């Protein structure tokens, strides 16, 4: 069995502004909110031990907005169980007032043109996030 991602921690400029969005997204897709971190951040966990955390930025560049075209994380994507679930999360994001970068649509340039259906949105720091459904390979 190949290695899988165990956890990801994201640096966030304003935890109070970002936490509600991450809570909406992560609980929608099955994560459970864990305990807060001592630094003010927190994490969400899956039953298999995978987790995603947010931590406050520190240091000289703490106020800098995320730039996905600089060194570091370009975007983060989660797998959806269905197209309907992509649409459901999109509706929740719109009601929340999240920044939608690209609404749910087919993106034939990805996945060899085989049914890649996704919504793209941003967190308050401008980090690009994605929720994507791809049909099982046949």
Residue ranges of each PLM-predicted region?
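N-terminal beta-strand motif that seeds the catalytic metal site of vicinal oxygen chelate
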Residues: 1-19, 76, 135-138
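Short glycine-enriched loop/turn motifs at secondary-structure junctions
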Residues: 2-4, 69-73, 113
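Core segments of cupin and vicinal oxygen chelate
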Residues: 9-58
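Vicinal oxygen chelate
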Residues: 12-17, 76-117, 122-124
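Long, continuous compositionally biased terminal/linker segments
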Residues: 45-88
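Short beta->alpha transition motifs characteristic of CBS
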Residues: 113-114, 120, 131-138
């Amino acid at each position: 069995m190949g290695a899988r991602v165990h956890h990801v921690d994201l640096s966030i400029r304003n935890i109070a502004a970002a936490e509600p969005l991450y809570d909406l997204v992560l609980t929608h897709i099955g994560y459970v909110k864990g305990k807060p971190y001592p630094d003010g951040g927190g994490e969400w966990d899956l039953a298999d031990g995978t987790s995603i955390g947010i931590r406050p930025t520190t240091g000289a560049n703490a106020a800098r907005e995320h730039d996905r075209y600089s060194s570091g994380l370009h975007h983060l994507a989660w797998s959806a169980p269905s197209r309907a679930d992509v649409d459901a999360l999109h509706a929740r994001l719109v009601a929340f007032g999240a920044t939608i970068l690209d609404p749910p649509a087919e993106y034939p340039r990805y996945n060899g043109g085989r049914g890649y259906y996704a919504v793209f949105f941003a967190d308050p720091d401008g980090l690009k996030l994605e929720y994507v459904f791809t049909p099982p390979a046949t």
